[in-house]
Amino acid sequence: MRQLAAGSLLSLLKVLLLPLAPAPAQDANSASTPGSPLSPTEYERFFALLTPTWKAETTCRLRATHGCRNPTLVQLDQYENHGLVPDGAVCSDLPYASWFESFCQFTQYRCSNHVYYAKRVRCSQPVSILSPNSLKEVDTSSEVPITTMTSPVSSHITATGRQVFQPWPERLNNNVEELLQSSLSLGGQEQGQEHKQEHKQEQGQEHKQDEGQEQEEQEEEQEEEGKQEEGQGTEESLEAMSGLQADSEPKFQSEFVSSNPFSFTPRVREVESTPMMMENIQELIRSAQEMDEMGDVYEEENIWRAQSPGSLLQLPHVDALLVLCYSIVENTCVITPTAKAWQYLEDETLGFGKSVCDSLGRRHLAACSLCDFCSLKLEQCHSETNLQRQQCDNSHKTPFISPLLASQSMSIGTQIGTLKSGRFYGLDLYGGLRMDFWCARLATKGCEDNRVASWLQTEFLSFQDGDFPTKICDTEYVQYPNYCAFKSQQCMMRNRDRKVSRMRCLQNETYTVLTQAKSEDLVLRWSQEFSTLTLGQAG
C-alpha cells in the first residue's frame, strides 16, 4: 500500500466514495440539519466504508499531501456533515481533544494521531464561545458577508472556500486526476485559469441572494465617483482612484501592513471586489474621456485603436492608463484590487489566459497569485518602449521577475536568507512571518494550502544554482521530487535541532533520489510529528 501512486490513490478513493452517494437520499426523511454531525447509526455506515484501516489511511495520505481542499476530500467531508461542511469550531467524542477550531483541523487530527474513527458530535456550548475572536478579526470584516456552510452545488461561494486557513476556491469542477498529478508540484497552482469560471458562478448565485444590497452599493459608489470626477483633471482622477481603492479595501491595507501580509490576497477574493472594481475602472475610463475636448478624445481613440493587441496603450485613454499605473506603482501591486481587476479585464477582453509573456521573449514567473501579472505591468508602466503582452509560446524562454516587483515585495515582509557556498537554508521572512510559522502551517494545512503553496514557490524560485537549477537537493545528498517534501524534511530536522539546507545539484555528485510515495510519507511524518508535539505541549 505504501507504494501507491497518485493515480491508484484516486481510483481507490473513487471506489470508497461511490457507495456514499446514496447516503443523503437514505437520510432525506430524517430531521438532521444540513451541516450537523452524523448520528451514531449514520456514523456506523460511514465508517464501514472506511474499514479496514488501510482505507482510512489512504484518505489520510491524500489529506496530508493535498490539504482539505482536494475535491475528493471535500465530497467525503460533505457526506460526514449531512451534505454541508461547517465553518468554525466543531466538537468530537475524544475525551482529551473535545473541540477543534475547524472541521478540517479535526480530520487532520484524526489522521495524525491514527484515531481514524473518532466522531464529530454536537457541541455542548455555542460555537461562538469556542471559536477564537482573534481569528474572526484577522480574516473577516464587517463588509464581508459570512456564509457558514458549504454545499456540493454552491461550493464556489461558500464558507469552506473562505475558511481562515484555506481561502482559495473549491475545485469541484476540476479533473481530480490532474490535481493529484500536480499534488506536490510547484506548478500545480491552477487558480488563475479557474478565475473566470469562479467569477461567473459567484456572480450568478451571489447576485440572486444580495441583488438589492449590491445595487444600492453600486449606485452609491457611482454617485460618489461622479461627484469626485466631474470637471476634474488627471490629478484628481488619480486621487479618485486612490479613494476608490480605499473603498474597496476598507480596513485591509492597514491590517495588512501591521499584521499578516499574505493573508490580504485571499481577502481580496472574499470581498468579491473584482466585478465592482471592473465597473469602477470602466466608469473611470469613461469619465477621463469626457474630461478632454471632443477633438482630443477622438484623436486619442484613433491612436488607441491603432495599437496592436496586447499593448498597454490599448486601454481607452491615456489618463485612465496613468491612473491604473499610478495605483499599482505607488502601492504594493500584488495586494491591490486594481491589479486584480486589471488582470480580469485583460483575461476577459484579450483572452491571454493565466500565463504572462511579453514581446521581449520573457515569461514572467508566478511566484504568487498576481506576481507574474504585476511583474509585466510594472515593466510596462516604466518602459519607454512599446512593451507588449503576448500569448506565451516556445519563443518565450527567458524566465523573468521584474526587479520593480522585488523592491515592492520588501514592503510586504519577504526577506531572502543568506547564500553560503551553494547552500540555501530558506527565506528568513515570508509575509512578515518566520520559518517556524510556515513549518507549522505546512504540517496542519498541507502542501496545497494557498498560502503554503505561495511560500513554497517563492522560496523555490529564490535559489536556482548548480548544474540542475530546478532540481532539489539537500546537504545530506538527498534529491527530492518536489519542494514540499524537502521543506517537510527540513522542518522535521529543525524540530530536532538539526540543520538541513538546500544545496545545488551537481552532475558529478551521487544523490539518494526519493520516490513520489516516499516524499508523501515525509509530508505525512512531519504532520504527525508536529501534531504529537502540540498535543504534548497542550497536555
Swiss-Prot record:
Annotated compartments: Secreted; Cytoplasmic vesicle, Secretory vesicle, Acrosome
Propeptide residue intervals: 26-269
Superkingdom as given in the UniProt entry: Eukaryota
Main location: secreted
Keyword annotations: Cytoplasmic vesicle, Phosphoprotein, Secreted, Signal
Ranges of compositional bias, category Basic and acidic residues: 192-211
Tissues in which the UniProt entry reports expression: Specifically expressed in testis.
GO cellular component: acrosomal membrane; acrosomal vesicle; extracellular region
UniProt cross-references to InterPro entries, sorted A to Z: Proacrosin-bd
Biased composition range(s): Acidic residues: 212-238
BP GO terms, sorted: acrosome assembly; fertilization; sperm capacitation
UniProt-annotated stretches for the region Disordered: 186-259
Signal peptide interval: 1-25
Region of interest called Pro-ACR binding, as start-end residue ranges on this chain: 26-106, 315-423
Post-translational modification: The N-terminus is blocked.
Name listed for the protein in its UniProt record: Acrosin-binding protein
Organism field: Sus scrofa
